[in-house]
Amino acid sequence: MPRRLDVLDAPVRLTHDGGELLARAGEPLLLSLLVGKGFVLSRSPKLHRPRGPYCLRGACEGCLVRVDGVPNLMACQTLAAEGQKVETQNVIGSRKLDVLEATDYLFPRGMDHHRLFAGVRGVSALVQAFARRVSGLGRLADHAEPPREAKRLEIDVLVVGGGTAGLSAAAELGARGLLADDQLALGGALRVLDPPRAEALVRRARASGCKLRPRTSVIGLYVEDRERALTALLVGPEGAISVSARRVVLAPGSHDPVPLFENNDLPGVMSARAALSLLRQGVLVGERVAVVGDGRFAAHFVEASSELATSTLLDSEMVLSAHGKPSVSSVKVRAGSIERRLRVDAVIVDGPAPPAFELGVQAGGTTRFVPERGYLLELDAERRVAPHVFAAGSAAGSSDSEEDGKGAARVALASL
């Protein structure tokens, strides 16, 4: 079970399913949930399999909870505060013992709810009514939030992504740029790999005069007038913002790799980047950790936790399956013709990270497949993905994100 490595000073008190938890004000709510309740935080919509956090970046559904009557909030992106009421969603029973988990055993090959008992007189209507009651995630909010009018901004250059490439681009753009990133803090991968360097990049970008907006997702990039500007839809703490940008620099980074073994969705299986992020924030995922695959995040985790946990390094091809109820407690591995089980508290996964190409494609760009990397955005000689849209960093296949970000910003400015 995850545990804290430090003592909470002046903690805030909140409740989770009626039980009291202690947290540090302003930290991600997920930390106190993991330490106080373990890895299982919710259930999947259809088969009600146990769910836990995988990425800690708001990109998976493993930490969705109801907070103060508001459904489907990501605990990794929600800040802990005094008096919060946190509730588990999508269970009949409890997080660890959900009655509807039986569907996972009754339908081992999956359930086609569209045809289940279809046409059976007297039964079909009952099944449909029940399915509608238990489907979906969460219940409507206790109180509807009044609508807020979207703000509108016009800028020269919008930078998407607050990692090394994005911050480097922002520093070049200065007051002519606006940077949006969906994380609680700027810095991207450097935030966990090299925190001091991440802080230095943030300070440099802020000193340049560039407007920095953490906790702000760019959820759409629309080509409405190729001769003048693109429209980006941003969503953050202030609500929706419609941004008209003459140029866009995409630096969204990469997604966490997905492990390819049976039961890879068990709570306690997470990315090495997520485990390292927890460690940087004072939470250890477990005393016995299986490290599957290799990469920067796995290497840093093993080094940083060497005196706190026992790490077992495994090639990704060795791992056959994860086991445990309701969270992972062992992995089955194969070396040659020999299979055995290893007892673990957590499984962390690293490896080639899939580039985040989605916004580039939405803006009209194309991708190319590189076997060892995945689908990368296709660039021309000036880093252009589509008219008025440039890309930098790992999404573009760069090996030097800092210089790549600077270069993309310079080209974007020169094209105005």
Positions of PLM-derived features:
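Residues forming the flavin
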Residues: 2-12, 25-74, 79-416
